[in-house]
A protein has these predicted regions:
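Extracytoplasmic metal-acquisition and chelation regions
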Residues: 1-185
């Protein structure tokens, strides 16, 4: 499901009311529905509580605009929230998630620490393998549909030469696509 367009339906609100922890990307990605969900939820998942985890607060954010207006398209004022597309960010998030789980359920602290260590070992091994397998792509020119791939492009060392969207969130026109094709020739 596209996180830009999730709807805070009654079934989701009911689940949030029972939750000990809400995990979101943050950086404004969930701005259209998360405030309603949190407003109708319990104290455990309110902003500032241990059960309210905005993962973007624990990783380096890219593409933070210095100024913003609607003519620039659908930009995220807090920077690019698609942090999960750089696997190194997942390691940073895992550390914070384990801390939160330990705070919520201290009786299982040892298990959380063991599982974090196991996860980080396996994830780092996977990152190393992915980087080796994709090394030949470094510097390759790519065209994206949306700015959501910026972390991925940065991680793999790709070269974004264009975007199907003329501006973030703005559907492409035939003229824009024609110009993009000419640029790529």
């Amino acid at each position: 499901q596209n996180p830009h367009f999730i709807r805070a339906r009654p079934s989701l609100i009911a689940k949030a009311r029972r939750a000990d922890l809400i995990i979101c990307s943050g950086a404004g990605l969930e701005v259209g529905w998360l405030p309603i969900l949190v407003q109708k939820s319990g104290a455990a998942v309110q902003p500032g509580a241990v059960g309210h985890l905005m993962t973007s607060e624990y990783v380096p954010i890219i593409e933070k605009p210095t100024a913003i207006d609607r003519s620039m398209g659908d930009l995220h004022p807090e920077g690019n929230p698609h942090i999960h597309l750089n696997p190194h960010n997942i390691l940073l998030i895992a550390d914070e998630l384990a801390k939160r789980l330990e705070a919520i359920n201290p009786n299982n602290s040892k298990i959380f620490k063991e599982r974090l260590l196991d996860f980080k070992t396996r994830w780092q091994k996977a990152i190393t393998q992915w980087e080796q397998e994709s090394n030949f792509l470094k510097g390759s020119a790519v065209v994206v549909h949306h700015k959501s791939f910026s972390y991925f492009i940065e991680w793999l060392g790709l070269n974004q030469v264009g975007s199907l969207e003329p501006k973030p969130g703005i559907p492409p026109t035939s003229l824009h696509l024609e110009n993009l094709l000419q640029q790529l020739d």
